[in-house]
Every structure is written in C-alpha cells, then in structure tokens.
C-alpha cells in the first residue's frame, strides 16, 4: 500500500489527535509504533482495521479496502448482463434524483445541518449511493465474467486515467 502511512498521519491529524492519543485507544500499540507506521508502508492489516475503526476514516477504508462501504454479493438476483444493466440504469436514476434534492450550499460540516437534513442525507442520499455501489459492482462483475474482460487490465487503465487527469499525485493513494 503506497503512502498509506502518510494517509494514516493525515487522518490522525484531521481528527486532532497526537500519536500518543491514538496509541492509547488501540491496545498493544505504542506512540513509537504509530510513528513507525506513519513513516512506512508496512502496516499489518489487523492494525490498519483498528486505525480505520478508531479514526472512523472513510479515506483510510477506501485506500485499504478499495471501498468505503462493502458491497455484498447478492445471491438472489438475476446477474445476467441485461438484468444488471437495467438495474444499473434504475439505480443511477434514483441516485440522480436524490442528489438533485440535496442542498449543500453553505454546508461544510455537521454543525451546518439540522436533524432533518442529516436524516435526508443518511436515508435518501447515502443509502441510495450504497445501492448504486452494490449494483455497479454486480454489473461490472457480470460484464467481466460474461464477456471475459481482465480485471487487472481494467484496474490498470483506471489508475492510469486518474493519474493522467491529475487526480492521483503519487502512487496509488
């Protein structure tokens, strides 16, 4: 995992924590081990899971797991290319409709939201995006399996595209 230590440091600082404060929240870790992890790429997965949990960091989770929310492999749906394409179009429309209703003008953090806005974001926007994420993963799996595309090649092309556009500055993360 390239630059994961740097991301860990950024996320710890974003939460306003010192290395010692973070170490105090994770049994078995010390300030010096946190320092070592932040300057390295070798962080054991079990510790990474603890960092994600304690820091409640969607960025770390995305960097480590490739997703913020895990998408289940649904086993009671039609996974044919046409069925998944149609479901994808339906989920895209529902997500677009939810996003169009979302007003984020002058909304930068949780203090800027009232309870109704928080509930709307959770129930109507984030849950809908989870549905779309699951659907898009199943659609991709269906297309890749049925039409014999190479997953590694798709990932490589996507990473290269993100680098060309300037969205990735160094390495993968």
What kind of feature is each model-predicted range?
Residues 1-13:
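A short, Lys/Arg-rich alpha-helix, primarily the initiator
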Residues 7, 18-19, 44-47:
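Residues that mark the N-terminal boundary/hinge immediately upstream of a DNA-recognition element
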Residues 16-33:
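Short alpha-helical DNA-recognition segment
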Residues 26, 37-38, 55:
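DNA major-groove recognition helix of helix-turn-helix
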Residues 46-62:
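DNA major-groove recognition helix of helix-turn-helix/homeodomain DNA-binding modules
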Residues 64-87, 154-173:
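Short, charged recognition helix plus adjacent turn
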Residues 68-134, 141:
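Helix-turn-helix/homeodomain-like alpha-helical modules used for DNA recognition
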